[in-house]
């Protein structure tokens, strides 16, 4: 029996390394709060708070996936039959799409630590959402997967 076909594209939007470094600032902050009470409490709270933040960041990293029938971005699912067009963006163009050129009706899956974007135009008269804007580290590959 042949294996079922897998996804055409799959990417987990993991946080960048600098996000973990930046969130490590909770360690000295919690030490400042709890060390006057107890050294042990300060150290334990610092470790527990940082671990909780790291686990939360990892557990909430969304999945972007394209298969033959669906485009999945986080918890949202879009039938590929309603995809009217796909445009990749990077650099200052991606920044403009997230900012000045953003339509308030758009559906967003944006992660600030991921520089690339793909804009997926929709052709669904029953949906007021004009497009999806999805963060990706590989905008060209995601675009190619959605166009195939």
Residue ranges and their predicted role:
Residues 37-46:
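Short, aromatic-rich membrane-interface segments at the entry and exit
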Residues 22-26, 45-52:
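Lipid-exposed faces of alpha-helical membrane segments in multi-pass integral membrane proteins
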Residues 1-36:
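N-terminal membrane-targeting/pre-transmembrane regions
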Residues 5, 26, 50, 119-123:
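Hydrophobic, well-ordered secondary-structure segments
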Residues 74-133:
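Non-transmembrane, membrane-adjacent beta-strand/coil modules in membrane-associated proteins
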Residues 129-148:
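C-terminal/domain-terminus segments
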Residues 47-87:
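Conserved beta-hairpin
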Residues 67, 123, 135-137:
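A structural detector for beta-sheet-dominated domains
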């Amino acid at each position: 029996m042949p294996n079922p076909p897998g996804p055409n594209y799959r990417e987990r939007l993991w946080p960048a390394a600098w996000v973990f470094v930046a969130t490590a600032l909770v360690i000295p902050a919690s030490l400042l709060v709890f060390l006057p009470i107890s050294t042990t409490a300060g150290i334990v709270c610092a470790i527990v708070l940082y671990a909780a933040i790291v686990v939360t960041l990892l557990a909430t990293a969304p999945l972007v996936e394209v298969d033959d029938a669906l485009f999945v971005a986080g918890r949202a699912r879009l039938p590929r039959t309603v995809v009217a067009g796909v445009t990749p963006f990077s650099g200052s163009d991606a920044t403009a799409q997230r900012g000045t050129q953003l339509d308030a009706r758009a559906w967003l899956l944006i992660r600030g630590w991921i520089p690339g974007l793909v804009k997926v135009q929709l052709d669904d008269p029953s949906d007021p959402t004009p497009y999806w804007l999805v963060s990706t580290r590989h905008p060209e590959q995601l675009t190619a997967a959605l166009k195939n």
